[in-house]
UniProtKB/Swiss-Prot annotation:
Residues passing through the membrane, by range: none
Pfam families: Conotoxin (PF02950)
Entry GO MF terms: calcium channel regulator activity; ion channel inhibitor activity; toxin activity
Comment, domains: The presence of a 'disulfide through disulfide knot' structurally defines this protein as a knottin. The cysteine framework is VI/VII (C-C-CC-C-C).
Name by which UniProt lists this protein: Omega-conotoxin TxVII
Keyword annotations from UniProtKB, A to Z: Calcium channel impairing toxin, Cleavage on pair of basic residues, Disulfide bond, Ion channel impairing toxin, Knottin, Neurotoxin, Presynaptic neurotoxin, Secreted, Signal, Toxin, Voltage-gated calcium channel impairing toxin
Source organism: Conus textile (Cloth-of-gold cone)
GO cellular component term, pick one: extracellular region
Organism phylogeny: Eukaryota, Metazoa, Spiralia, Lophotrochozoa, Mollusca
């Protein structure tokens, strides 16, 4: 019984500590998901709609647009 009470108190304390020390920039929930909101307005902006390149297709090392994620001028494997 004492252990259960201690666990409940610990969880309540950690929850209160999390809310007390959370960084609130003054906007609250306004800018919580700005990118997701932009993607809802413009579905083409979503990364899920972008096509990845298959093996042996030319790729850009900096954009990492290969399906496998390995690019050495051409997508590997």
């Amino acid at each position: 019984m004492k252990l259960t009470c201690m666990m409940i108190v610990a969880v309540l304390f950690l929850t209160a500590w999390t809310f007390a020390t959370a960084d609130d920039s003054g906007n609250g929930l306004e800018n919580l998901f700005p990118k997701a909101h932009h993607e809802m307005k413009n579905p083409e902006a979503s990364k899920l709609n972008k096509r990845c390149k298959q093996a042996d297709e030319p790729c850009d090392v900096f954009s990492l647009d290969c399906c496998t994620g390995i690019c050495l001028g051409v997508c590997m494997w």
